[in-house]
């Protein structure tokens, strides 16, 4: 009695599904009665709508994550992510109008042709979202929390950037420090992916079947749940 469950979709590009809203309608036919909330993963802002918000907030408001991808329009164009600030603003405006007081913005760091200006653009984008929130009417005392979530770019085979160099761990750490120095609001929180884990991911992405014995040996030496920072044993790897 009084308990609540959450169905969370963790797939990629969920909002691309042609019948997503029909699926949400079907789930909501019983979810609200059974106190089950629905949550979606990182969303493309160009596919985000007020209708989508309404269908995922019937029990409670779960987190919203928008894939902003890069800090500047120049870099978003380089990686062929057709996301504009106008679309980001529209998505956040819809969310704030529906009562959301926190959003997460997903970015990548270490992208080809990236400069410090692009890193600064990540902080600038988050600040613009904060400013957008306070430009709208809200109940007194309601504040906003914008979380920047930054992953490290890893070149993958059979992609346009497969032959691009991956940023060195030292370079990524410097960029992460620079990003933190560009954030000046307590309304903005920064989370970033561990560069050492990304280095291993790059090794696995470029490797072949000859890596299988390495992975098995690491397992035998106690490397379990390496996606969790507290369990990651880089020295063992």
Residue positions per predicted region:
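Short, small-residue-biased leader/transition segments that mark boundaries at the very start
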Residues: 2-7
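Acidic/polar loop patches that form or flank catalytic/metal-binding clefts of enzymes
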Residues: 8-9, 35-39, 103, 146, ...
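Glycine-rich beta-strand-to-loop/alpha-helix junction loops that act as flexible
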Residues: 9-12, 151
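Conserved AdoMet/S-adenosylmethionine-binding subsite of the radical SAM
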Residues: 15-147, 155-175
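Conserved beta-strand termini and adjacent loop/short-helix elements that scaffold enzyme active sites
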Residues: 43, 151, 193-195
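Flexible helix-coil linker/hinge segments at domain or subdomain boundaries
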Residues: 134-141, 180-192
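Short, conserved secondary-structure transition motifs
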Residues: 150-160, 197-203
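Radical SAM enzyme core and accessory elements
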Residues: 176, 185-237
